[in-house]
């Protein structure tokens, strides 16, 4: 009898011990879940696509082939592999990882193209007209690399690419060549607007102004896709000043600053060179009472 009672007590003691230990691993799982939530809640900067089709989901199509292809995943913001069936599908499908990155990642958009004339032009000027996937009817302008001119088109209101300008003048200043095949006169006009003074211009030989700043400073203001009404600043490359605009809260481009000072620091630093057959003039900007003046520091003139 005594042996049986001891056995029952031992059994109940074991049960109590197991119940006391059970919450420990449950709490551990909970903590792991909390840690995982903290990691995944990290906010990423707004996604900016080069082409609207980069936002499409991977589509293997109705056929049954097994072909390795790549697509741009807007959630991971990377090009990833998927299996394509061999027919139909959509444009977010590339034969190689390199082709996917070239068409859909932002690193490619910030490259600068140098031509044989040593002029500089943002790479997005060479993108094709893209109205986007929305159904708006907004008049915009794009640079047509076939005709070498800025032309009007109808923008849907969302996505699309960076070859998209609100005004014809803005498109011409950024993407079109000057009358002699140089992107000169446009940037020369910018300098005059920045300094509120006349800068000596050569009428005999062509010259070239190079903007040595971030390429996104040359992009137009982009309100974005959402419905907020936040006060922001963008750099207006036509007049050479930072101007306010209303930001919707998502989307848009990198020419977007929370303060005028931040805009000036990002887009007005550096220097501009003037190159011509007659010589090389290096200029640096000096600030004085909120005005910028050109100081000619070094002048190298060739003996004719």
UniProtKB/Swiss-Prot annotation:
One of its GO terms (biological process) is cellular response to steroid hormone stimulus. Keywords: Blood coagulation, Disulfide bond, Endoplasmic reticulum, Glycoprotein, GPI-anchor, Hemostasis, Lipoprotein, Membrane, Microsome, Protease inhibitor, Repeat, Secreted, Serine protease inhibitor, Signal. The record marks 256 as: Not glycosylated. Changing residue 135 to L: Abolishes inhibition of X(a). Residues 1-28 form the signal peptide. SUPFAM superfamilies: BPTI-like. Glycans are attached at residues 42, 145, 195, 202-203. The keyword Coiled coil does not apply. This is Tissue factor pathway inhibitor. InterPro entries: Kunitz_BPTI, Kunitz_BPTI_sf, Prtase_inh_Kunz-CS, TFPI-like, TFPI/VKTCI-like. Inhibits factor X (X(a)) directly and, in a Xa-dependent way, inhibits VIIa/tissue factor activity, presumably by forming a quaternary Xa/LACI/VIIa/TF complex. It possesses an antithrombotic action and also the ability to associate with lipoproteins in plasma. The keyword Signal applies. The record marks 64-65, 135-136, 227-228 as: Reactive bond. This inhibitor contains three inhibitory domains. The first domain interacts with VIIa and TF, the second one with Xa. It holds the Pfam family Kunitz_BPTI. It comes from the Eukaryota. Residues 54-104, 125-175, 217-267 form the BPTI/Kunitz inhibitor domain.
